[in-house]
């Protein structure tokens, strides 16, 4: 929803420059807006809530709970008191040319059956080079605060691996449309749509 206000992961001369946030911010929004446009294709008994969290990327690494301010607030003050859902999927940096999505550590702890189901769907759709069934370290992201506040099982589709870190354009002026890859957005969007058409089986037991 929002972007890091400065390119503090780039060269010194650019570290006070704003970034477009085409991937780290806008890519997830783009996929969800397209999903919303096509939501009429879903069965009538499938309920979908789409939430855009603000102020996710305004924090300071050394300051606890300074990131993900929108999701922290929503988890304590949901739009419907007592709100719950069968599961949730967070999208973060889902438009990169080299994007690879691993089993993020917190997601595996809180919703392993969802991870397995979503990644299986992606691989069956031909996206096994993007959705890789290999675990990586936990990250603090919006899904962490949603789970903490609501206990809704959450998974994070995020371009991150503990050995390589975030994409090279992350928090730099190069996070722009030139580095957005339409096939990556398509892979994530189609995987999401098919997940809604065939939810994880354990939801019905």
Which residue stretches match the model-derived regions?
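Generic structural signal for helix capping and beta-alpha/helix-loop junctions
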Residues: 4, 60, 164-165
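Active-site-adjacent substrate-binding region
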Residues: 87, 96-205
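Acidic/histidine-rich catalytic neighborhood of metal-dependent amide-processing enzymes
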Residues: 17-113, 142
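A mature extracytoplasmic/lumenal domain signature
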Residues: 1, 52-54, 159-161
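A substrate-binding/cap region within the structured catalytic cores of diverse enzymes
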Residues: 7-11, 59-65, 117
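Soluble metallo-hydrolase cores and metallopeptidase-like ectodomains found primarily
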Residues: 1-18, 41, 191, 198-199
